[in-house]
């Protein structure tokens, strides 16, 4: 039995943490020029990691979903390498700052955008599954992310070939 998969991506958007600025701080503003690299290692907060992990685990539990990859996958491997002790946010930040750029590009950048304050979860939908209704699956994921995982609509977006294909099919159905 042959069958394929269709990619779907869930983009998680995190609220911007604007630093409280007052007029008094302006005279010292030029001191923080090297701050950007430091800010990167502080991006890895418990809330962000927990949110990525909960969405990853939810998607992984759906019967129509095949492989799920995200920053959570990397954390799972790092935990195994750390004698099954979970990494703390400080350890993740330090590790991130010490990883060579070439490795960051390969294993972290596809799943985390610190600049955009986003995380990407990539998954494959099993097309050969009996009774797969793509539109219903997309609606279920949207509903569950909002109602079961308590994310706001502004905090996530579904994208990828599955969405394009589903939109094409829906347009065809409506034109009949």
Where are these regions (language model features)?
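Extracytoplasmic
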Residues: 1-176
């Amino acid at each position: 039995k042959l069958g394929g998969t269709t990619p779907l991506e869930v983009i998680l958007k995190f609220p911007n943490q604007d630093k409280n600025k007052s007029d008094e701080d302006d005279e010292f503003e030029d001191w923080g020029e090297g701050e950007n690299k430091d800010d990167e290692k502080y991006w890895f907060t418990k809330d962000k990691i927990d949110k990525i992990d909960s969405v990853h685990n939810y998607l992984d539990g759906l019967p129509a979903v095949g492989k799920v990859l995200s920053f959570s996958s990397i954390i799972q491997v790092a935990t195994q390498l750390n004698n099954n002790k979970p990494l703390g946010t400080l350890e993740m930040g330090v590790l991130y700052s010490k990883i060579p750029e070439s490795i960051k590009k390969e294993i972290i950048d596809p799943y985390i955008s610190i600049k955009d304050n986003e995380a990407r979860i990539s998954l494959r939908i099993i097309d050969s599954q009996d009774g797969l209704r793509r539109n219903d699956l997309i609606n279920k994921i949207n509903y569950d992310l909002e109602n079961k995982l308590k994310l706001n609509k502004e905090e996530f977006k579904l994208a990828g070939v599955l969405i394009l294909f589903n939109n094409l099919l829906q347009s065809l159905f409506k034109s009949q």
